[in-house]
């Protein structure tokens, strides 16, 4: 990324369109504080979530229940609440008491998404939208929770698919060849994204 500079206000959903392999993971990790920029500074004035899909905080040989309680203690939140919330949202039933290492990638994504939403952040970082799931009930609950969080928090969704951003994004940006261009609407961002990626 080259001289990327932007500001995100609390209570906004920013959708960032970017092709795979063009700095998407780097952008998210720097916002979360997992990587430092080579130059410049990142100023954070709120509590920012770990990126959805980041498994660095959990232990795969432990069960979902054990991971919930461990992460809750790290963040100073009631372990019983975090466990109950995750059980309710991810709907893994008996698998909740099995090691994460035995989960499919879809099950891991559902668990990590539920764990992230169980914790109280001002800003949530989401890579490629909600986990893809055939579970209609999970999709319904997760969508409703995200819409509700938008009223009081900031959500940043980074994706290479404009349709993933359409449901939630209020403002948009395009990250391409190291440059980040901000737009007031997703439709404006999509026009540049389509031009850059199809030319």
Describe the predicted segments one by one.
Residues 47, 52-136, 144:
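ABC-family P-loop ATPase nucleotide-binding domains
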Residues 53, 159-167:
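Conserved H-loop
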Residues 145-159:
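Conserved catalytic loops of ABC-family nucleotide-binding domains
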Residues 168-185, 193:
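H-loop (His-switch) and adjacent beta-strand-loop-beta switch element
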Residues 10-73:
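ABC ATPase nucleotide-binding domain signature region
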